[in-house]
Regions:
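Intrinsically disordered, low-complexity terminal regions
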Residues: 1-285
Length: 285
């Protein structure tokens, strides 16, 4: 009898699998012609965003979904172009649970000219961006950010994710509530902050501490690599760790295991590094 019950249960399960509807996928795309320096704003409630660049005078946007349809009863796409300014807003449906409780996914792929102002905001997704020059702002509520080759005024923020940026050039500000930060590039200005993660930063030749740099972790290790000719006033302090400086420094104030103040080369703008509960290491690039 037990074998019959098991057999019936197995047949019912197989029938359910066979008759289950396939996961739905949908997509939408549009190309926008631009002339000169463009402004692009992309916002999505719950999706991943990827930005790449090319030598072109157009912006191409491609939205793909799984377990969502695109349209009035599913994912809505609001888009507007006013000259060289383009706004894209991708909204998830109010009820967004799919088959057997599985939620759908949204992905936004954007191909842009190499020079433009970029503003990306996603509530709960990862963002990747590759060589773009302009005013750049990337914000995610609960995802990771990966950026490469961004130039200009750059702001990267994650509420609870990792930030990795390489080959940056210009003024960079990054912060995350609870993630690790890895950055390298040539900086005119550098601000990096994490509530509960480590910071690993490398400044390339040509970097300048003009308007001041600040690196802070509430509860993590900080490593900063600087070129040998960087001019700065150093102020490094940790509440519960050690500070090590492996570059030439002229001590002008405090020098002990947890705090260092002094000049790098001829001095200059203020380079402030602080950690509430982690070690600080300053090394040569």
């Amino acid at each position: 009898m037990s074998h019959r019950v098991a057999l019936c249960a197995g047949l019912l399960f197989a029938a359910a699998v066979i008759t289950a509807p396939a996961a739905h996928a949908d997509d939408w795309s549009k190309t926008y012609a631009v002339n000169g320096h463009a402004d692009l704003h992309v916002q999505t409630d719950d999706g991943n965003v990827s930005v790449t660049s090319a030598d072109q005078n157009e912006i191409y946007v491609h939205v793909t979904t799984t377990r969502y349809t695109i349209g009035s009863s599913g994912v809505s796409i609001e888009q507007n172009q006013n000259g060289n300014s383009i706004d894209i807003h991708v909204r998830t449906p109010h009820f967004h649970w799919g088959f057997w409780g599985s939620s759908g996914t949204i992905r936004v792929d954007v191909r842009v000219p190499r020079n433009l102002n970029l503003d990306v905001n996603t509530g709960d997704g990862n963002v990747s961006a590759e060589p773009v020059a302009g005013n750049i702002r990337i914000v995610t509520g609960d995802g990771n950010i990966t950026a490469n080759g961004l130039h200009g005024q750059i702001y990267l923020h994650s509420g609870d994710g990792r930030i990795e940026s390489s080959s940056m050039d210009g003024a960079l500000k990054v912060d995350t509530g609870d993630g690790h930060i890895t950055i390298d590039g040539r900086f005119d200005s550098l601000q990096a902050q994490t509530g509960d993660g480590s910071i690993d930063a490398s400044a390339a030749a040509g970097s300048k501490v003009a308007d001041g740099w600040a690196l802070h972790s509430g509860d993590g290790r900080i490593t900063l690599r600087v070129p040998s000719d960087l001019n700065a006033e150093l102020d490094a302090h940790t509440g519960d760790g050690s500070v090590s400086v492996d570059v030439p420094i002229t001590v002008s104030g405090t020098l002990n295991g947890s705090s260092v103040r002094g000049k790098l080369n001829s001095g200059g703008g203020l380079l402030r590094i602080s950690s509430g509960d982690g070690s600080i290491h300053i090394e040569k690039t």
